[in-house]
UniProtKB/Swiss-Prot annotation:
This is GDP-Man:Man(3)GlcNAc(2)-PP-Dol alpha-1,2-mannosyltransferase. Residues 41-233, 255-399, 421-492 are cytoplasmic. It is an enzyme of class 2 (transferase). Pathway: Protein modification; protein glycosylation.
Length: 492
């Protein structure tokens, strides 16, 4: 009797849900229809708005080209790509209107342009219109202590919506890695869209870190120690990677900055027919003016690091390896050594990280030998590189590494991380000759630094000559040719 009652209850529940299936399906269908109609109405409204503010020159309507770059005043390698891209486009298409969506609301457009000139020595020939976005906080990583990738990606859609509501372009370029804005501008804004990808939001390497339960800056120790949490995070990553691939595939053209990035984007976005490597522009000519002889104003050796103070740059590894070098090798080398960390601070989070690094150097007892140079001018940067013996880079799987190229062009002996762009594209043999060194661990960096410093001046000079000869492929001129070739599809 109890079994019959139980069977009847299960049957009743199933019948109840079955009775809801078709009404639910109809409701979902109606909602989808309303959503499509709503998006169509919004698109129609935006197109009318675009026509009402469009301008013409010599009787021809001007094309509006917009770059989505919320941190355009940050002063990093990604910003150099932005300004060089604008300079190249203005040369070839001077009649177009150029717009930059930025969240740098505390400065004026002219101050942003002046900063680009000071840091990168880049001056644009024609005006640029800046659209200032007030909701940039939606893409700050500090806002999402958990589910950071998802939070920032959803936040970028809202930030993109703010941008689209202020100015509707004809051509939209995501130059900072906010791929979730692409379908918004393509299907709602009616734009032709493209991407310049510095670093995939998620990569197969990140999946491997979680799968193997390895701790890292994007995989907290409490998760890596727990098999259940690791499994849950892996599922989250796989789902996110699937959606990331869908939004990325909306691009009409895709430019990537290295072989490493290309491999990951092809795996995730599956748009090989419109994807090309466009190496980022590195100001090699300016640095090539630095003499190669070892000019020494003070005795000893200077070790220089270039890179924004972000967690993935792993400046802590540089300080730890340098402390190890001083503690274990300095007596053998007999030199006065100094480490100078040069980089840009975008916000309070970056400033907090700098203070943490200062504390680390104090705890390791090397504070007298470590200096921090924040948001310095281009001339100051060039001066430090002219005095440096070693250029340091410690980011795991750096997408490319403009700082690495700049160090090589300036004549430092580069010591970079044995992964990503530096390993695959930059610190590679030139005509069979060594162009620099690679390392991974604290001990490996300390040993490599000691080895470089133990070389004779003539041996270091030969390595520096090899490095300089190998980097012509990363010049501004090469970037302009490749970038304009890719952009032609969107502008013709």
């Amino acid at each position: 009797m109890a079994a019959d009652t139980g069977s009847w209850c299960v049957y009743a529940v199933l019948r109840f849900f079955y009775s809801l299936f078709f009404p639910g399906l109809m409701i979902c269908g109606v909602l989808c229809v309303y959503l499509v109609i709503g998006l169509w109405v919004i698109r129609w409204h935006l197109q009318r708005k675009k026509k009402s503010v469009s301008t013409s020159k010599n009787g021809k309507e001007q094309t509006v080209v917009a770059f989505f770059h919320p941190y355009c005043n940050a002063g990093g390698g990604g910003e150099r790509v932005l300004w060089c891209a604008l300079r190249a486009l203005q040369k070839k298409y001077p009649e177009a209107v150029y717009v930059v969506y930025t969240g740098d609301i505390n400065v004026s457009g002219q101050q942003i342009l002046d900063g680009a000139f000071r840091r990168f020595n880049i001056k644009l020939a024609h005006p640029v219109q800046f659209v200032f976005l007030r909701k940039r906080y939606l893409v700050e990583d500090s806002r999402y202590p958990h589910f950071t990738l998802l939070g920032q990606s959803l936040g970028s859609i809202l930030l993109g919506w703010e941008a689209l509501m202020q100015r509707v372009p004809d051509v939209y370029i995501d130059s900072m890695g906010y791929a979730f804005t692409l379908p918004l501008f393509k299907y709602v804004g009616g734009c032709r869209v493209g991407s310049y990808v510095h670093y995939p939001t998620i990569s197969t390497d990140m999946l491997s870190v979680v799968k193997n339960q390895n701790p890292g800056f994007n995989n907290a120790a409490f998760i890596s120690r727990n098999a259940l949490l690791s499994k849950a995070k892996l599922i989250y990553y796989y789902l996110f990677a699937f959606v990331y691939g869908l939004v990325g595939s909306c691009s009409d053209i895709v430019m990537v900055n290295s072989s490493w990035t290309l491999n990951h984007i092809l795996s995730l976005w599956k748009v090989g027919h419109c994807t090309n490597i466009v190496y980022p522009p590195c100001d090699v000519q300016t640095f090539l003016d630095i003499p190669l002889h070892e000019k020494k104003v003070t005795p000893g050796h200077l070790l220089v690091s270039i890179g924004q103070f972000r967690p993935e740059k792993n400046h802590a590894l540089q300080i730890k390896a340098f402390a190890k070098l001083l503690n274990e090798k300095a007596a053998e080398l007999g030199h006065s050594l100094k480490l100078v960390l040069i980089g840009g601070c975008r916000n309070k989070d970056d400033e907090f990280r700098v203070n943490q690094l200062r504390s680390l150097s104090e705890n390791l007892g090397v504070q007298e030998n470590v200096e921090f140079k924040i948001n310095i001018s281009f001339d100051e940067l060039k001066n430090y590189l002219s005095e440096a013996t070693i250029g340091l880079h410690t980011m795991w799987n750096e997408h490319f590494g403009i700082g690495v190229v700049e160090c090589m062009a300036a004549g430092t002996v580069i010591l970079a991380h044995n992964s990503g762009g530096p390993k695959l594209d930059i610190v590679i043999p030139h005509e069979g000759q060594i162009t620099g060194f690679l390392a991974e661990s604290e001990e490996g960096y300390a040993d490599s630094m000691a080895h470089i410093l133990s070389l004779s001046a003539e041996e270091r000079l030969q390595i520096r000559k090899n490095a300089r000869a190998s980097i012509s492929r990363f010049s501004d001129q090469e970037f302009e040719v490749a970038f304009l070739c890719s952009m032609e599809k969107l502008l013709t």
